[in-house]
Design a protein with these regions (language model features):
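Signal-transducing coiled-coil/dimerization helices and immediately adjacent hinge/linker segments
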Residues: 135-188
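Structured interaction and signal-relay segments at domain junctions
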Residues: 2-83
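Sensory/regulatory domains in signal-transduction proteins
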Residues: 62-121, 146-150, 154, 161
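Polar/charged, Q/E/K-enriched amphipathic alpha-helical segments with strong coiled-coil propensity
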Residues: 113-117, 123, 127-145
Length: 188
């Protein structure tokens, strides 16, 4: 699993700095879509949605789906269950999906698209304070698609490089352990 390959504190620090630099909310999840890092820079809108059990369930399922949407093992941009734009970069070790770096919680600048209307449609079955929800939604940043695509590529490169280093360190430790065990066996 991811936490056995890489120091989670290092991933947390990278995630925090990425989020600070880009302004995007971010979290790293395991193979089941469950966070292994603390969320960074989550919007008030998303934090509010996640305070409701059904909201948290949908967000977790969406995070899981987002990470797995990457059939070609490349980053992907998608719309979450609340209508916001998210991105997912798969973390892959030896051709196996072990988690994802997720970011976003923004709106894409699009003509002829009423994002707020879409959000209310997506969340119609939630028993929430609609006025408060609307206020929080108005605080969500609108960004150009180019910025989201660049962020997706960046987190894909960063996270997979770090995981490859971690996997290499694990292989080296295993080899050292095997050499030591063989030497101990021969010495006895």
């Amino acid at each position: 699993s991811l936490d056995q390959i890489v120091n989670i504190d290092i991933l947390q620090e990278i995630q925090d700095k990425f989020s600070e630099a880009t302004g995007l909310g971010a979290v790293i999840v395991d193979v089941g879509g469950n966070p292994i890092t603390r969320p960074s820079n989550f919007t008030k809108f998303c934090t509010y949605i996640r305070t409701y059990p059904e909201g948290l369930t949908r967000c977790t399922a969406c995070d899981d789906r987002g990470g797995r949407m990457t059939k070609e093992k490349k980053p992907t941009v998608y719309r979450c269950h609340s209508g916001l734009t998210d991105l997912a970069a798969p973390i892959i070790v030896q051709n196996q999906y072990i988690g994802a770096f997720l970011a976003g919680q923004v709106l894409l600048a699009q003509d002829d698209y009423d994002a707020k209307e879409d959000m209310f449609r997506c969340l119609a079955d939630f028993d929430m304070d609609k006025e408060h929800l609307s206020e929080l939604f108005d605080m969500v940043e609108v960004v150009p698609e180019k910025r989201i695509t660049a962020a997706a590529d960046l987190i894909y490169i960063m996270s997979n490089y770090i995981v490859e280093i971690g996997a290499s360190n694990l292989a080296q430790k295993k080899l050292v352990h095997e050499v030591k065990a063989k030497a101990d066996l021969e010495a006895s």
